[in-house]
Amino acid sequence: PRDQLLNWSAREVPQRRHLVAQNSRFLILPSTGRWPNLASRVLKLICQELPGDWEKHFGHPVLLVEPFVDPQRFRGTCYRAAGWQALGKTQGYERRGQDFDMDTKHPKELWVHPLGPGALEKLRAKELPPTLQGKGKPLPPPVPIASAQMNSLFDFVRKRLTDPRHRN
């Protein structure tokens, strides 16, 4: 959903993902007591402080925050109350490591919040402004073979490599 909102191609994602921060842990337990609007106040403070802290730590700005909410456990009410935009469900993949996605078949709800005026326009631009370029992952060269050839290469290697663990 995020890539569709921002009109990112598959090749642009690795170049621009560094401009998006994931808010992966945010929960206010009921035992905290009753504080009106506590969650939306905390989210507002996070969004005010995050850009400066991020740039200080990583050396480049961050333009968008995205949390993934498990709809089987939570409703995302705090994000709705804080004015974040719900983009819909993910495809059910979970990031494991820098470039490895695991299919969990458990879609999450994706919410986004732009950090500052013009953030979405910058992220959607055909060319990133110079201050945002060069910080993402460099693009790998295009693979000069077709996917059918890649599958046959995989089969070729798989048939010829043995797992040394089976010797025990």
Question: Where do the model's predicted regions map?
Answer:
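Secondary-structure boundary/capping micro-motif
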Residues: 20, 24-28, 50-57, 74-77, ...
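Acyl-donor binding region in acyl/amide transferases
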Residues: 1-117, 128
